């Protein structure tokens, strides 16, 4: 089993739910990214999603768009993100890291070169927002050949056919976008999430993480009751946007620890 599979197997055995925080690599300071990754892990993150900044992040709301713009302005590239993962791996060999981003930077590097470099850096999974599953079969095969899990998005509008397509090629976990629209938008309707998850789990043989609209311990716990993992991003990016530079890592760790405690309570309730 790879790191993602080991993580979810351990969570299932312990009756706990996964916590998957997202930050944008290089924001607000490229020199702080690895420190922030360690803060997430120390706070209780099970998997870290590391955003690769892109100039046209179509699925992201204004908070993450701004973070991408700041990172790009500071010279962050796919290569520098891979270097961050490699530095993180110098002292953390256990926490899975998933790169989340768009196809263009990967295609500019070349899919084969990306697979080789990502594997060497210690990347465990990759979620490419604009690779629909019906067109991503070859990409998914190349990622798996490099021991990297191809992770795909599902949404409230996903048909049973689309869910089945994802089920055929996904590994690691799937990311269920709980709201229509962009990241950081709207209010959660946990009952609608609960209604969709069984259809996903009947067709997809990997854990289901739920994201978009999760902002605090209360919403995280509610979503954890009906899913395998909770993904939180925009709230963390906002936290880093507003925190004093010298206290940002500590604030991140504290916030993640609060979510971890809430999720552990949800896991115990669910058993």
UniProtKB/Swiss-Prot annotation:
Active-site positions on this chain: 49, 60
Stretches assigned to coiled coil: none
EC assignment: 4.2.1.20
Family assignment from sequence similarity: Belongs to the TrpA family.
PANTHER family: TRYPTOPHAN SYNTHASE ALPHA CHAIN, CHLOROPLASTIC, TRYPTOPHAN SYNTHASE, ALPHA CHAIN
Assembly notes: Tetramer of two alpha and two beta chains.
Protein name: Tryptophan synthase alpha chain
């Amino acid at each position: 089993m790879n790191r993602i599979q080991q993580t979810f197997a351990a969570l299932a055995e312990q009756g706990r739910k996964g916590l998957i925080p997202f930050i944008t690599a290089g924001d607000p300071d490229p020199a702080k990214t690895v420190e922030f990754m360690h803060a997430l892990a120390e706070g209780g993150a099970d998997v870290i999603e590391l955003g690769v900044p892109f100039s046209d992040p179509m699925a992201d709301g204004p908070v993450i768009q701004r973070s991408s713009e700041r990172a790009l302005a500071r010279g962050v590239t796919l290569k520098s993100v891979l270097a961050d993962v490699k530095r993180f791996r110098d002292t953390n060999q256990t926490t899975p890291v998933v790169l989340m981003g768009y196809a263009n930077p990967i295609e500019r590097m070349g899919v084969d070169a990306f697979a080789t470099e990502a594997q060497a850096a210690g990347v465990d999974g990759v979620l490419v927002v604009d690779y629909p599953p019906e067109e991503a079969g070859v990409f998914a095969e190349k990622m798996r050949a490099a021991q990297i899990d191809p992770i795909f998005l599902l949404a409230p509008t996903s048909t049973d056919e689309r869910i089945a397509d994802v089920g055929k090629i996904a590994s690691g976990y799937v990311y269920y976008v709980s709201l229509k629209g962009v990241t950081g938008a709207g209010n959660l309707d946990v009952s609608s999430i609960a209604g969709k998850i069984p259809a996903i789990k009947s067709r997809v043989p990997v854990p289901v993480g739920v994201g978009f609209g999760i902002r605090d311990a209360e919403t995280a716990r509610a979503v954890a009751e009906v899913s395998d993992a909770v993904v939180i991003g925009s709230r963390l990016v906002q936290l880093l946007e507003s925190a004093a530079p010298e206290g940002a890592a500590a604030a991140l760790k504290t916030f993640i620890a609060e979510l971890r405690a809430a999720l552990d309570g949800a896991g115990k309730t669910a058993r």
